[in-house]
Amino acid sequence: MEGVTLAHKQTGREHEISCAGLFCFIGARPATAWLGDSVLLDSDGFILTDRQLIGTLGAETARALPFETSRLGVFAAGDVRHGSMKRVAAAVGEGSSAVRSVHERLAKET
């Protein structure tokens, strides 16, 4: 890699930058504003799950499964979760692990 060409989304104007590498930080800022106060977030807007809820919900925390949020039956995984690694492979792994917790929660509810 020798460089990149950046294009302004609105004007189309291009700007070239010499560089030896490019690092994408998708997920560096969580897009959680739409959640409102439906689940607990940290001060940066990342979703709190399972162990991070200790002391915030009392007895409810003991019931939280891995990747479960402050709202029973609602799960979060990947970059949007507080304490996640912010890497694609880790997010994929968390997603598949969260599915197991979803199945466990559904089994408890039926």
Predicted regions and their residues:
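A Rossmann-like FAD-binding core segment of flavoenzymes
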Residues: 1-61, 104-110
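A conserved FAD-binding loop/helix module that cradles the flavin
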Residues: 60-72, 77-110
